[in-house]
Amino acid sequence: DWGGLIGLRIAAEHEDRFKRILAANTFLPTGDYRSPDAFIEWQQFSQKTPVFKVGEIITSACVSDLSDDIRKAYDAPFPGEEYKAGARRFPMLVPIKPDDPASNPNRKAWEVLKKWDKPFLTAFSDSDPITRGGDAYFHKLIPGTKGQAHTTIIGAGHFLQEDKGEELAELTVDFINNNPVT
């Protein structure tokens, strides 16, 4: 789930290792602009809820109903609450203020991404309250988005791989095929 927040910085820091990027339901905030209320609520929930039910959290961010087996699979790595410290901490690593620790590294990444002319595709969903519409920011700032087949995936929440995995896979394959490495 942290592919954009981690992956976009890695791509910016190691441009030579990346030939194309597909960004889905993500953002790379610097804390310079107000975060969506839904994200602030998520941060607060992650810190205050006494029981952090990972499978239920994933399910709540999906449009489709996940099977009990899938929910259990998301819970499986965490045999007890004490094993969820990292999962609880991750939301707090996202900068929401200009002086947060990740703000400057994200700003540096944006300086690279604003010059990124390699293929860059966005595939956002229509039902993610945190990232919905965020693709427009990428389109405006990243030159590599020009001429790509950007899409809004209908009927999907935050976890595209769960709600519309096959559609996302097809988009990915098409993106790779339409932008061969030279």
Regions picked out by a protein language model, each given a short descriptive name:
Residues 156-169:
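Catalytic histidine-centered segment of alpha/beta-hydrolase-like enzymes
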Residues 2-152, 161, 173, 179-180:
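Flexible "cap/lid" subdomain of the alpha/beta-hydrolase fold that forms the substrate-access gate
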